Each structure stands twice: as structure tokens, then as C-alpha cells.
Amino acid sequence: QLVSRIQRPMLDAARLLPIFVNSMTSCERLMELEKLPMEEDVSPITLKGNIGIRFSDVSYSYSEKGRAVIHHFTHDFKPGSFTAILGSTGAGKTTLIRLILSLITPTEGKGEAYTSEGTIALSPALRNNFSYIPQGNTLFSGSIRDNLLLGNPHATSNDMRQALHIAMADFVFDLPNGLDTRCAEQGGGLSEGQAQRIAIARAILHPCKVLLLDEATSALDIETEKMLLKNIKQHFQDSTIIFVTH
């Protein structure tokens, strides 16, 4: 009996340790966010016509004395083009996406968007023209319908069905509750591949002229990925697509 009295508190403490570590990690991340400079609130600018993205001699480093992640990069992502960006981890692929979204600004050089009507420097005001699918699982706690409506609050059930079909996510309609199926934070209850396809469907629902996919198909098998990219090309025929992969 004495042994059990000693063991029980120790076991309880051992169970609490992972929770404590996770909590501390979360606190550290929140503290990092607090240190970030506040972004100025700007009115969105909607560009008319097909959009191209052009970088001229762009370099970027995450610190003043650090190695340049992107070094004198020049490229023109022409309107309506489909571009695959390949490279190993740390090669600067995600950094390029962040530059397009103006989450960071070039250390050197310039980035700009252009249409047949003119050219404008990349800025936070242009983000409404883009649809972005980041790495990892980006679903939120709630129903599949709730997650899809984040892409377009006015989407109908038919719109969602079409987007899910394009994203190779017809499996949703085989689930007992269909669109009203609940998923936990980060798509809990779904496989990673299923969660990725729902995230892609959400991006498809968002009207955009530029689609950015940052390793958004990493959990899919090759055949499913091929079919998905084929569907995306057909659906976004007039949009500029930038696809980041390994």
C-alpha cells in the first residue's frame, strides 16, 4: 500500500510531463509571434485580367549576416503558366512563396505582379488575388463543410461537391455524414492524404488568379497526384499556378 501511494503521484507526474513540454513549446511560439512587427492594415487591391509574377535579381536572407536563402533570383512566372519548383529542403522554395505573398520582403531586388493593364509591386494588398495551400495539415476543428466555407463563405453544397471532385476528394460523400462529418484539429479522424485533398478543395473554392501549392500533395501516391494536378490545370486554365515539390 505504501508503494502504491508513492508510485501513483510519480505516474501522474510522468503523464503530465508531455503536456507541460507541449505547453512550453506553444508559449515559446506565441512569444515569437509577439516579437514580429505589426503589419500595416491595407485595403485589398483586386487585379483585373490574368496575372503574372516577376522577380528581378531578388536575394533574401533571414538575418543580416546569414547566408542568402535566395541569391540573385530572376524569373518571370507568365500569366496562365504552370511552373513546378523543385529542390531539396532548405533550398528556398517556401521562402519564394513567402516573397510572393509579401510575408517577407526581398533583401535585394524586387518582385512585382503584372497584368495587361500594368505592373504593381508585390504587397500584402494583393493577397486576395492568390489562393495558397501551405505545407502540412491545415484543417481546423469542425465539420468538413465549415473548413470548405473558409475558402468561400458563399459556396453552395454543389460548389463544394465540384471542388472536392477536382481535388480527388470524392471519398467525403462516402462518409456517413458527408460534408457534415466532424474532424478534429489538424484533420484528426482523417488520413493525411485525405486532409490534404480537403485543404486543396478549400483553395479551389477561393476565386483566384494565382494558385500557390507548397508541397500540398506530399501525402498522396503518384497516380492520385498526377490526376489531381491534371484536374487543377483544367480548372485553372487562365490562372498562374506555382507548384512547389521535392
List PLM regions with ranges.
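ABC-type nucleotide-binding domain
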Residues: 49-246
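Pre-NBD coupling/linker segments of ABC/ABC-like ATPases
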Residues: 38-48
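Conserved E/DxxT/N motif and adjacent residues on the DHp alpha2 helix
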Residues: 32, 39, 149
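Conserved NTP-handling cores and scaffolds of large molecular machines
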Residues: 10, 37-38, 137, 152
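Cytosolic ends of transmembrane helices, especially the final helix of ABC transmembrane type-1 domains
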Residues: 5-33
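Short, hydrophobic secondary-structure boundary micro-motifs
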Residues: 14, 41-43, 173, 183
